[in-house]
Amino acid sequence: ELSGTVETAFIGGWHRNAKYVELRADGIRRVMTERGLDAQDPDVCLYFSAHGTPISYLEEGSQYQEHVEESCRLIADAVAVDRYELGYQNHTNRTKVEWTEPSNQDLMPTLEADDVVVVPVSFVHEQSETLDELDLELRELVEQLGMGFHRVATPHDHPDMGAVLADLVIDALNASAGAPLAHVGASS
């Protein structure tokens, strides 16, 4: 049984953190170097895959799509890539829900590239939506289309990820110095 309260603070917009953007860019550069790919080659497509979200959430004020698009732009800029694509991993089994577009399944066949470097932009750790939906399902589609599939890992085990998260917390604490944080009480 828990009792008491916990002070909390919301840390938003951390996709803009320069160190976070750089470690995401580092992952892309690493894959491109290992695979002998050139980010400036027009036959190489930098492809961001984001978790889809219902349009109704966006209509209710969620900034998710804006943040994903901004994150892609910042990371692409850090890699010095002008051309990139963004597709969404939508839950196609939920047909009564309108999802963010374009879906990976719709966008991928339209690409004109020999190689696709896939970045799971809205994921910070590996899970079924990266390991299954990207590594198995999307890879199969990409290879059926005759393109090379190159997946960038999520940053969960990047040596700088812990420091990025610590900096975000420290910055939030410093910003709230003297200001009350929100209180979350445990129910008894």
Protein language model features and the residues they cover:
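Extended amphipathic ligand-handling, pore-lining, and cofactor/metal-binding catalytic surfaces
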Residues: 1-188
